[in-house]
Amino acid sequence: MKKLFVISTLAVRLIALVALTSCGGKDNSGYKELIAGKWVVKSYYHWYHDFTDESLSSERSYTLSDTNYIGYDSAEFNTNGTMRWHMNDRYVSSGMFSDPYINFEWRIKGDSLFVSPNWVADNIAKYAIKELNSETLVIEQHLDNEHPEYSHHHWEQIHRYTFSRCKK
């Protein structure tokens, strides 16, 4: 169960990162160049509301100083549609994964985003770019369980990531 939670959490992060290139149907070519390169998570905000069991609801924020959670995640985007994600090494040392790196492919077709491998149903997540410039990237991902597969448990959550561009 813990491994499934970690995989789904990583998938949420990865899909959120990849979704940055899709900006509401606008021309995405400029975003590919601006996003290209290596980014590291500077802070992370998570809000979760469980309508089925209120006691499970939570809200928390982490910054780079919280070394047990933030400061290890990084992603490198290439304009050719590939991305390399570096996970926290503790997942590897715990035996959950054999390699801290996961390679992904992404592409945009119209307003739709496609990710491979696809671990989380794209139709339960909505993405928004809150800030994007040469040094900072802020994205917000909103998920809810309106998908029929999840109708037995009603929940909603927001993930907000603030990234800093890695210095060369």
Regions from the PLM with identified roles:
Residues 23-168:
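Lipid interaction determinants
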